[in-house]
Regions:
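Primarily recognizes the serine-hydrolase "nucleophile elbow" in alpha/beta-hydrolase
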Residues: 160-231
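Alpha/beta-hydrolase
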Residues: 95, 122-124, 208, 269
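Alpha/beta-hydrolase active-site loop
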Residues: 140-172
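The feature captures the conserved acid-bearing segment of alpha/beta-hydrolase catalytic domains
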Residues: 204, 210-265
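Bacterial N-terminal signal peptides
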Residues: 46-55
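Short substrate-entry loop that stabilizes the transition state in hydrolases
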Residues: 87-89, 97-131, 214-215, 246
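N-terminal cap/lid segment of alpha/beta-hydrolase-fold proteins
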Residues: 61-85
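C-terminal catalytic histidine-bearing segment of alpha/beta-hydrolase fold enzymes
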Residues: 263-307
């Protein structure tokens, strides 16, 4: 081999080391990167497809729709959570408690829509953005000796708001009007039982902790809820946590239901959190991992039952 030829060869090899090899590595790295992206994208869409096809699971609505409806000349507001799809779906009317600003109940909305239920949170008169006077202010205006009776009177009047909410829900194209449940916590549990006296065509009643905070001090309320259980027009599942303010609602109303041979179940769960309020409102609104499967099983049974 000629010396100049060898020299040229070494120079060419140096050029290849400087340019050709890095260029090849860059191309190779890009090919690997794009293959990786395609693989990840395929896995994502396959996972999304499997999730969409899974039985009993729906894509949860990220935000509810704020709606307006009327009750007794008052403009009431509420929040409507809907599963993905056209429906018609079974639905739940959720009765909030005594809080001034009930909100949209996002934990419950997500839970129920993921299981293919429309979830409606109507705000009764004087609460949230709804017109009217706040029930707690009206109770406080009564003489102390009359407050227990006054609270029951006001609760009875607010049943009209729940019925208006139910009628609004039945009018929605996404809702199956023959598969509606009424539920709620605390004051909302009271509303659930009082509304359940009416023959409104609902499939079930699921009261959480009805009157538990005021039970011991309010004999008129005790008597009224006993009567509501006697007159109930739908099966009842009453739920409380062991550290609620009082477990008397479960015990007294269960005894009455058994005596009258009503379609009634009650369940007391282990303590939730550390305080009475944790076991009361916290349990109702955020412990879906504790009571959720039991409620869904109860609702499924009632949805299948013939009226």
């Amino acid at each position: 081999m000629r010396p100049d030829s060898r020299s040229t060869s070494i120079e060419d090899m140096g050029t290849q080391r400087k340019y050709s090899r890095p260029f090849s590595l860059r191309i190779f790295a890009r090919i690997i990167f794009f293959y990786f992206l395609a693989w990840r994208k395929e896995r994502f869409f396959c996972g999304l497809l499997l999730f969409a096809l899974a039985p009993g699971i729906s894509v949860a609505q990220t935000k509810p729709e704020e709606v307006v409806f009327s009750s007794g000349g008052r403009e009431l507001h509420g929040f409507l959570w809907k599963p993905e799809g056209a429906g018609p779906f079974p639905a739940i009317v959720w009765n909030h408690g005594s809080e001034k600003l009930p909100g949209s109940q996002p934990t419950l909305g997500k839970f129920y829509t993921e299981h293919s239920y429309v979830f409606f949170v109507p705000h009764r008169r004087g609460q949230g953005r709804s017109q009217g006077e706040y029930i707690q202010d009206l109770v406080a205006q009564a003489p102390p000796s009359e407050r227990a009776r006054r609270m029951v009177e006001l609760q009875q009047a607010e049943v009209d708001d729940v019925i208006a909410a139910l009628n609004y829900l039945k009018s929605q194209p996404s809702v199956d009007p023959g598969r509606i449940v009424i539920s709620g916590c605390s004051y909302g549990g009271i509303q659930t039982l009082l509304t359940g006296e009416r023959d409104l065509g609902v499939k079930a009643l699921v009261p959480f902790a009805p009157g538990a905070m005021s039970w011991e001090q309010n004999v008129p309320l005790q008597d009224r809820l006993v009567r509501a259980v006697d007159l109930a027009k739908a099966p009842i599942l009453l739920i409380q946590a062991e550290n609620d303010y009082s477990l008397a609602p479960s015990r007294v109303l269960s005894k009455e239901a058994n005596k009258k041979k009503k379609d009634f179940q009650s369940k007391i769960y282990p303590a939730f959190g550390n305080t009475h309020q944790d076991g009361h409102w916290g349990f109702c609104s955020s412990a879906t991992e504790v009571w959720g499967n039991d409620v869904l099983a109860f609702l499924e049974t009632q949805m299948k039952a013939s009226r």
